[in-house]
Swiss-Prot record:
Taxonomic lineage from the root: Eukaryota, Metazoa, Chordata, Craniata, Vertebrata
Tissue specificity comment: Expressed at high levels ovary, heart, testis, prostate, brain, spleen and colon. Expressed at very low levels in liver and thymus. Not expressed in peripheral blood leukocytes. Not or reduced expressed in lung, prostate, colon, pancreas and ovarian carcinomas.
Gene Ontology process terms (BP): hematopoietic stem cell homeostasis
Cellular compartment(s): Mitochondrion; Mitochondrion outer membrane
Keyword Protein transport: no
Domain of life: Eukaryota
Protein name (database record): Armadillo repeat-containing X-linked protein 1
Segments in the Mitochondrial intermembrane topological domain: 1-6
Length: 453
């Protein structure tokens, strides 16, 4: 029974030692925060071996009972292997502890001391468990999982340090594997380390760097990050001027032509923030017709369309550039009828900007509109839509009176906005029906409109 008990204690000590080795391995692997875990195709028979190799020096001789020993501070290559057959020092101490009758605690302590010596030797030389020898390279461009721009998956250009690459093993002789080497994981590109965070508030030199990156790259991932960074900085007035002075508006606006809807959306968002500045509007006006055309033909209710409508709304807050969009009035009203709730609200804000400019009244009321537009005056719509459509009607009605267009009704067709709002009488009936609306704000707005009729 004595030898059986002794063998059981040795086995328990080996299990504890293996666990401690794994902990040392995990801690050493986590020391380098800038390195990623490299995915490798390992054979199932080699999972117990992990080699440790320092930058310079000679290998230590892990003799019986001595464990891993340093032969010099700068010229040592300690080799640590986690298999029992490759750890004679660990075995020796475990057996010596069992012969002395120290029990399970003594054996575990002996194992821990040996591992501690090996770990301290490794830490002193800055070695890394499971490192890969040779240079790291990036595979050529192919799509990879994990995101739009793709992470980078390094490939190996050298042999694995440790048990398999050391040439000689300390245990049984191992036959060479006949298995063909695994192919490297193809990636689209290396991950680009953008120099700034997207929410950083940048100075003029930093903005110049971002603009240079945006101008030179064709990578959609980098373009998106750069546009978001510029758009966030354009929310601040001092950076609105800086981006314009650095020639940033043409650099950003050239991406309107890209086919990628995400890039176009980010481009419109950046230009939208820049358009708050009156001087920037003078630069953006060159592209306003192009933005309008793209907004009308892109997918209905898409994020690109909403971003384009927001930009057009900002550009028409003043009267300076409204005439550049007068050719699109029929498209605006068609979109008002076809769009979803959010598109309807945004397009009504855009049209209201035109109704506040009396000089645009004639072109506005003479355009053709769908007769179904009258359905927007139904009480089933929510407050925001009703308030906007009532404001639109109020402004047009006031402008018709102020511009004296009521006497020129013959020049407007039956499909025009003038006929729908002024001559048909259907619109007035719909508005009167809203006088009993449950929402007090809507009811007050209806009464205000009716008093002006």
């Amino acid at each position: 029974m004595g030898r059986t008990r002794e063998a059981g204690c040795v086995a328990a000590g080996v299990v504890i030692g293996a666990g401690a080795c794994y902990c040392v391995y995990r801690l050493a692997w986590g020391r380098d925060e800038n390195e990623k875990i490299w995915d490798e195709d390992e054979e199932s028979t080699d999972t117990s071996e992990i080699g440790v190799e320092t930058v310079k020096g000679a290998k230590t001789n892990a003799g019986a009972g001595s464990g891993a020993k340093l032969q010099g501070d700068s010229e040592v290559k300690p080799e640590v292997s986690l298999g029992l057959e490759d750890c004679p020092g660990v075995k020796e101490k475990a057996h010596s502890g069992s012969h002395s009758g120290g029990g399970l605690e003594a054996k575990a302590k002996a194992l821990f001391n040996t591992l501690k010596e090996q770990a301290s030797a490794k830490a002193g030389k800055g070695a890394r468990v499971g490192t890969i020898s040779g240079n790291r390279t990036l595979a050529p461009s192919l799509p990879c999982p994990g995101g739009r721009g793709g992470g980078c998956h390094p490939t190996r250009s050298g042999s694995r340090a440790g048990g398999r690459a050391s040439g000689k093993s300390k245990g049984k002789a191992r036959s060479k594997s006949t298995r063909a080497p695994a192919t490297t994981w193809p990636v689209r590109r290396g991950k680009f380390n953008f120099p700034y965070k997207i929410d950083d508030i940048l100075s003029a030199p930093d903005l110049q760097k971002v603009l240079n990156i945006l101008e030179r790259t064709n990578d959609p991932f980098i373009q998106e990050v750069a546009l978001v960074t510029l758009g966030n900085n354009a929310a601040y007035s001092f950076n609105q001027n800086a981006i314009r002075e650095l020639g940033g508006v043409p650099i950003i606006a050239k991406l309107i032509k890209t086919k990628d809807p995400i890039i176009r959306e980010k481009t419109y968002n950046a230009l939208n923030n820049l358009s708050v500045n009156a001087e920037n509007q003078g630069k953006i006006k060159t592209y306003i017709s192009q933005v309008c055309d793209d907004t009308m033909v892109c997918r209905l209710d898409s994020a690109v369309q909403m971003a384009g409508l927001r930009l057009l709304t900002n550009m028409t807050v003043t009267n300076h550039y409204q005439h550049l969009l007068s050719y699109s009035f029929p498209d605006f009203f068609a979109l008002l009828f076809l769009g979803n709730h959010f598109t309807k609200i945004q397009i009504m804000k855009l049209i209201i900007n035109f109704t506040e400019n009396p000089a645009m009244t004639r072109e506005l009321v003479s355009c053709k509109v769908p007769s179904e537009l009258i359905s927007l005056f139904n009480k089933e719509w929510d407050r925001e839509i009703l308030l906007n459509i009532l404001t639109l009607f109020e402004n047009i009605n006031d402008n018709i009176k102020n511009e004296g267009l009521a006497s020129s009704r013959k020049e407007f067709s039956r499909s025009s906005l003038f006929f729908l709002f002024k001559e048909s009488g259907v619109c007035v009936k719909k508005i009167k029906a809203l006088a009993n609306h449950n929402d007090l704000v809507v009811k007050v707005k209806v009464l205000k409109v009716l008093t002006k009729l």
